[in-house]
A protein has these predicted regions:
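Auxiliary, metal-adjacent structural segments of Zn-dependent hydrolase domains
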Residues: 1-42, 53
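Pan-zinc metallopeptidase signature
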Residues: 129-193
């Protein structure tokens, strides 16, 4: 039933990059789901879901979309694993976002002005409080990867924002990509939105 629940949320073919579905538990109210690459190139992925935390439908939906966004933005078409760090592109340990990727474009659009502030004070919640109006959730302020995952989740789940707050600009960012708009349309149809 968990696989069916996940499959029911996402557009047809969205899970083609996944080779493994894992059911695990770390107890109630802990990690609901995660994704992880299965190889050193980000080509094949694992999706893991905890049935102990999967009962609340809204939280389950938000979490699956969030975790799927990590796959969407960090798979081998979007990121280069093992490439040398580049000052021109967004980097995480062991990964460089490809030029023109969703994550690199998002980083350049929204994070270059934050970087020194974020690195100077690793207290995520303090950083969030200084920039609260710029993030859709406090967790989004963790780093660009979490920000894009949270932003894409609510791009899918919410109606298009009409304001000009930075968090709204982040949700509207995804309208630049016809394939992401199509993903949104199909996912919303599956969710009855």
């Amino acid at each position: 039933p968990l696989w069916a629940q996940v499959n029911a949320l996402l557009p047809e073919g969205a899970l083609d990059g996944f080779s493994r579905f894992t059911v695990f538990t770390d107890g109630l109210d802990e990690t609901l789901a995660y994704v992880s690459p299965l190889d050193d190139t980000g080509t094949r992925w694992e999706l893991a879901v905890d049935p102990a935390d999967a009962g609340e439908l809204d939280w389950f939906t938000e979490t699956v979309l969030h975790e799927y966004t990590h796959y969407l933005t960090l798979n081998d078409t979007q990121a280069d694993y093992g490439a040398p760090e580049s000052g021109a592109r967004y980097c995480e340990e062991g990964m460089v976002a490809r030029s023109g990727s969703y994550l690199d474009d998002f980083y350049h659009a929204f994070w270059t002005d934050y970087l020194h502030d974020r690195l100077a004070n690793p207290d995520s919640y303090g950083f969030y409080l200084r920039h609260q109006a710029d993030f859709v959730t406090d967790y989004a302020s963790t780093d660009p990867s979490e920000d894009i995952a949270e932003s894409f989740t609510y791009f899918v789940l919410w109606d298009a924002p009409e304001g000009d707050a930075v968090w709204e600009e982040k949700l509207n960012f995804f309208y630049r990509y016809p394939e992401l708009v199509e993903f949104r349309t199909q996912a919303r149809a599956r969710l009855g939105l």
